[in-house]
Amino acid sequence: SVDWKVYAKSDRFFIKEFEEETNLRGYLVIDSSSSMAYRSQDTYLPKLEYGVDLAAALAYLMIRQQDAVGLLTFDDQIRKFIPARSVGSHLRILLGELKLLLRHARDAERGLGTRIGQSLHHLADRLSRRGLVILISDLMDRPEDVLTGLKHFRHRQHEVVVFHLLDPAEVSFPFEEETVFVDLESEARLSTTPWEFADDYKRQMDAWRKRYRQICAEHSIDYVEVQTDTPFDVALLRYLEKRRRLH
């Protein structure tokens, strides 16, 4: 005779195993350091607010596709870790945490440094199963540390997407009059005449972005530069393209 209780339990187990193998397991990793509070014009969103809105849209898409999604937020330390789940009620938890993240960031405004590489290693060591890791950051840290952290995920067979958020002014450097620049993380101030080093700044900025692009490409990491005047659908389409390739 068949032990129906054992059969039912086994059946549920195999269904669960199948779902875990076919559905994606994703983690949204958000940099909330003080440099992410920057915006050059009131018409642009601060980088963090843009990133939070992007993360909320991604979480919604993932839950709708019955993918599990988790969240890690950090500045110079881990601020929040929420394991991945795929149930509809989990979306409310994630959105609530993203709302809190913005509120805390506005209260702090300045003085929060960043340790991107360390935070990536922390998450890589916690993930036991392969999945998709989505980093949302301005990458304002030592490139060596950031890239080593990203490669840690690839070594463990995770797929990785990097949304590199930049304010348009950080790329074009439109400043012409004497300006006081403030480092939002260290709070150091520099009063200077921008035209004296604008060309050098642009060269270094171009080289910095190019390095991220090249090394990410070499390690099959999807690198997407997103300036905060870019419509969200551009970034979301890149995610959907990646999601389609994984199935």
Question: What are these language model-derived features?
Answer:
Residues 1-12:
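Membrane-proximal, non-transmembrane interaction regions of membrane/secretory-pathway proteins
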Residues 6, 15-56, 60-247:
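Exposed, interaction-prone extracellular/peripheral surfaces
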